[in-house]
Amino acid sequence: MPHTTTNKGLHDFVDDRVLTDYARTGVRAVDLGSGPGAMADRLRRWGCDVLAADLSADGFALDLPHVSVNFNEPDFASKLGRNVFALVTAIEVIEHVETPIGFLRNIRELLAPGGVAVLTTPNVDCLPARFKFFLSGKIRTMDEHGEPTHISPVFFDLLYRQYLPLAGLRLRQHLLFPQNGFQLSRKSVAWIMRLAAHVVPGESILGDNHIFVLESCA
């Protein structure tokens, strides 16, 4: 299995809870931001016809087709194929791009009729993130202690009301990982936050990551 730097268990969770519904033998799939190939490998094991795509193939560890593409380009979908993929995956990618809505529009262009896209991104709506912003004015996983290439936080409310309609997409399924807590917080903090989550109102209180299953509005 290729090495990955995403939260431990996230790929397995997506595999078990999402890909089981959409990945099938012969399904044409593209993995955006493939990195070393952790998700592309899972798609391959499901029997999908997989294309991997990232800024470069450096470190890509699989014997699969790979296309080098810059996701900040306004029409990167044209390099991969329009309306041909039944399954698009982008695991922890959208937070790295300069224009999330443009990225989503390209995903819509990639989708074949009836296809779905599976995206994950840090949950900046979760309770620890809300406390961090309240106390410091900084966004969890995106401050000076976080990943330096995280530049575009995705808030669920904005995604649902603004980003997706503007991109021509709609939400089919929304999951959170982990479902009952937090991996990125210290154990003592995570315990307190889990207790507080029972009384604090709001969407997406638990979980370090959003998982979105999207489909075209057309």
Where do the protein language model's features map onto the residues?
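Conserved class I S-adenosyl-L-methionine
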Residues: 119-140
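Acceptor-substrate binding/catalytic loop of class I
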Residues: 140-159
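Short conserved AdoMet
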Residues: 24, 98, 112
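Short N-terminal helix/helix-N-cap motif within the alpha/beta-hydrolase-1
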Residues: 98-102, 129
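A short glycine-rich, Lys/Arg-flanked "PGG" loop and its adjoining helix->strand segment in the class I
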Residues: 102-113
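A SAM-dependent methyltransferase catalytic signature shared across enzymes that methylate proteins
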Residues: 159-175
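Conserved N-terminal segment of class I S-adenosyl-L-methionine
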Residues: 1-83, 87-91, 101-104, 119-121, ...
